[in-house]
Amino acid sequence: MIDCDGYRPNVGIILSNQERRLFWAKRIGQQAWQFPQGGIRRDESPLDAMYRELAEETGLGPEHVEVIGKTRDWLRYRLPKHLIRRHSNPVCIGQKQIWFMLRLVGDETCVRLDSVQPAEFDSWRWVDYWRPMREVVFFKRHVYRRALRELAPLLFPEGMPGQQRQPRTRSGA
């Protein structure tokens, strides 16, 4: 399902543990790390899609998590030109996402990356709050920044943790 602007409706999932560290997963067979995410089907609400994607990608069910909140609006990213499938109809130019902040209330041993085949991830770890912004693929970075900034007060009511700057690259001598 792609909207009239070419964006595929999608949900993103930020899962926190009790130490307020975030679930960070490695895409199978790649060195790319990301939060769980996935498309919203025509007959689904964003909340229903989030629970389905959570189960498919992590093996966790509603009994394992508490929904802390979600973004107010859709957050959009465009795909780089080389990833756009120009021969599909309609053409998908990117994703629009509602992001959910969850807290793990079950045991992390319940995480099963192989609960659905084919699996999307082959490894996962807990990371500091701002680390995903530095490690995610470049074209998703601004959406991660917006989602993390908007949802941080829900996880850190006493004040947002310090945001680490992205490393700068140097050119020339």
From Swiss-Prot:
UniProt keyword annotations, A-Z: Hydrolase
Cited Gene3D superfamilies: Nucleoside Triphosphate Pyrophosphohydrolase
Superkingdom, taxonomy of origin: Bacteria
Cofactor(s) the protein needs: a divalent metal cation
Domain Nudix hydrolase: 6-149
GO molecular function per UniProt: pyrophosphatase activity
Pfam families in the cross-refs: NUDIX
UniProt cross-references to InterPro entries, sorted A to Z: NUDIX_hydrolase-like_dom_sf, NUDIX_hydrolase_CS, NUDIX_hydrolase_dom, RppH
EC numbers: 3.6.1.-
Motif residue range(s): Nudix box: 38-59
PROSITE patterns in alphabetical order: NUDIX, NUDIX_BOX
PANTHER family: GDP-MANNOSE MANNOSYL HYDROLASE, MUTT_NUDIX FAMILY PROTEIN
Family designation: Belongs to the Nudix hydrolase family. RppH subfamily.
Cited function: Accelerates the degradation of transcripts by removing pyrophosphate from the 5'-end of triphosphorylated RNA, leading to a more labile monophosphorylated state that can stimulate subsequent ribonuclease cleavage.
Protein name: RNA pyrophosphohydrolase
UniProt organism field: Thioalkalivibrio sulfidiphilus (strain HL-EbGR7)
